[in-house]
Amino acid sequence: MTINGCKVSFYYTAHTNKVTVEVKNNYKSESQEIDSKNFFNTFQAIKFRTLLNVTCLKEILTDDGVINLKGVNLSDTDLKGAYLSDANLSDADLSDANLSDANLSGANLAHANLTMAYLSEADLSNANLSGADLTNANLNQTDLPNVNLSGANLAHANLTMAYLSEADLSNANLSNADLKRADLSNANLSGADLTNANLNQTDLPNVNLSGANLAHANLTMAYLSEADLSNANLSNADLKRADLSDANLSDANLTNVDLKRADLSNAILKGANLLHINVEGTNMTGTKPWAHTEK
């Protein structure tokens, strides 16, 4: 890169996490190390200054080097591969935006509008998406460990093969969402709406689904070992070949559930409604106790 007749070069050193900026002309050379995060944030802020027609960089870059895009309109914007780690995007409009491969780790996206957004393979680890609207969003193979999605709207979202370990999805709307082969180990889904959701072959060990609504959900071959499903509504759900070993299903509604060839060994079914369930070939070893089976 040439600026005012000087050749400017940038070198990233992984083990120091620094960027060296070197400026050369015909007579001398100067170099300086910069923290890589501040470097990338500054460059990203310059890009957004042009995109948003902002005159002063300080309007979108804080003194601490954090990108502040709170409440901005970035709908239908191509942000593929953008570096937005720890950025403030709360209340922003990102509907239909392309955020694939973007780094949004630690970002604040609380109450943001992400309807129809494309977030495939983005990094959203430790991000705050509480109350965000992700209706019909594409989160295929997205990294979302420890993310806060409490109260978020993920209806009809594509979360196939997404990584949501230890995520907070309490009271989230996941109705009709596709979570096939996603990893939700140790996640909190208490009170979540998962009606008609696809959880085929999904990893849900130790997950908290207490009080969740899973009516008509597809849980075939799902791994729910040691999951808490107390007071959950599983009516008309498909649990064929699911692993529910050591799961807590106390007071759950299992009316018309298909448990063919499922593993319920050592599961707790105290007070559960088991009316019209299919237990053909089901492993009930150590299950305790049965109740509410009246016809």
From Swiss-Prot:
What the entry lists under Gene3D superfamilies is as follows: E3 ubiquitin-protein ligase SopA (2.160.20.80), Secreted effector protein pipB2 (3.30.2450.10)
Record bears the keyword Repeat: yes
Q: Give the transmembrane ranges.
A: none
Q: Where is the Pentapeptide repeat domain?
A: 67-106, 107-146, 162-201, 207-246, 247-286
Report keywords, A-Z.
Plasmid, Repeat
Q: Say yes or no: keyword Repeat present.
A: yes
The protein's matches in PANTHER family, at most eight in alphabetical order, are given as: BTB_POZ DOMAIN-CONTAINING PROTEIN KCTD9
Name recorded for this polypeptide: Uncharacterized protein in mobD 3'region
